[in-house]
Amino acid sequence: MKHKLFTLLIIMILASVILAGCAPKATTTPATVETQAPAQPTTPPTTAPVAQKRVFRESFSWPDRIDPAVGNDFASSTSLANLYDTLVFPNAKGGVDPWLATSWDISTDGMTYTFHLRSGVKFHDGSLLKASDVVYSYDRIKIIGEGYGYLVTAGVKSVSAPDDSTVVITIEKPSALFLPSLVRLYIASEAIVKANTKAEGPYAENGDYGKEWLQTHDAGSGPYMVKEFPLEQYLLMEKFTDWWGKFNPKAPDEARFIGTTEAVTIRTLMQNHELEVTDQWQSLEAYGALSKIDGVKVAPIPTLSGFYYMVNNKKPPTDDVHCRKAIDYGFDYQTSLTLEWPGVQQMIAPVPATLAGVDKSVPYYTYDVDKAKAELAQCKYAGQLDQNPIIVQWVSEVPDEEKYALLFQANMTDLGFKVEVQKVPWLSLVENTSKLETSPSIATIYVSADLPEAGLMYQQRYSSSTAGTWQQNEWLQDPALDAKITDALATIDQTARFAKYSEIQKDLEDRAASLWIYDQIDKHAYRTCVNLPTVRGETSHVMGYDFFLADIGVDCP
């Protein structure tokens, strides 16, 4: 349908051009000519050519939640990074740069941050951004408690605005990771949100807090703004020309994030020049076909992500540590790596090895059938495995996941486990993992670190705060582990902090909390007429910032 609409639009444009060219020129009534004036050189009408829009289109696994207090997956994070500004911005070196905050002061005790805001920043309605908007945005994500709320509100004592250009944030304990966490505090206009808030809703005097409206609109100040958003199909954004920042001279005028990963559709769109960049969820076979299209390349991009088999620690038979260890020893990791893009590596820790603070000296699980059988013999379900099947749910939008599920099924069947493999849409898996009763034995999910250090990913993957979200199907809910993570994150000295990360790493390995498969390398097929800084390693790999549209150049016919 989209293709037909696009084709119709092109036909209409061509028709208008042809009609303009064929229209009769203005004439005057001819007079009787006895003598003729010398011929004068004629010039064609000087109508300015209509500038061709630069368009960028990328496919994503859907849905795309663009409410800054709700979205936290890949599509949502990429959209939010372009629609909203943040106080600081992640750089390619793993640190942060000034953004809405041009500078900040830190108190001697390390617990009070005073941010000085950039002047003249406009929201998409033309109103000026003020410090009170920062406070409102923080309060909103804290009260709603979704999205990246667990990250940006953790350990924060208070947020205030003494004047329009100053924000003061006080934290409970010094933390080296507080400042980087602010790349997830997307600043929304208080006035715009309030003007579109329904009085009735679950947030007391805040009604619905603008959640219904913000599903399909934005209240940001970022380089792009929502033009239209039919929820199930695509998000269309247009350049915000009053953005305070600097655009690539060839930055797209419009960007369309398309909600499909279906291989035939993607290939057709690329062949027809109706897609500039694919999602990262195509199969190896699909990437091979895409790479044969003229003007298309496939780029491997390092990430902060890992591929997890999230093992439910609360349901039989995986609530028994010996069954979990049997699984971790019984999986053929090396064979699994051959199913992926060349160059991927087995996960050697509970978080990706690309993160600072991973202890590479800690032993990790390798394929060892004898050890797997020895552990299984100690499992309390050893004699009744047929009565306690392992339910594996893989994401239908990521077809390559089926190969891993079938390999897992074969490996575990050899040990004596009964395994049922289920193909489910991403939205269904998100819903299933939200409640213990509906959580499968294993959910197969890619997770990207919110920040480029191990501690934050231990928090987002294994702390009680993320149980009941798609980021944790393990349901650990262990106060002792929570305390370890909190203590490590509050440790300012890097050497001491990394030592505490090592202890957490050993703890999770000893529990066999998950089946850790491989450190992800994203693959994107892209048209070579698009200038992508991320392909050259010039962007942060914090999820969503790889495709910051203001830095992308489009020079496609």
Regions inferred by a protein language model and the residue ranges of each:
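Ligand-site clamp/hinge motif
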Residues: 242-288, 418
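Surface-exposed binding/hinge segments that line
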Residues: 150-202, 230
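Aromatic- and charge-enriched surface segment that lines or borders ligand/interaction sites
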Residues: 102-147, 162, 168-170, 269, ...
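Detector for C-terminal structural segments
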Residues: 230-234, 239, 330-359, 400-409, ...
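Ligand/substrate-recognition segments at binding pockets and active sites
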Residues: 25, 29, 58, 230-233, ...
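N-terminal lobe/hinge region of extracytoplasmic solute-binding protein
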Residues: 59-108, 139, 219-221
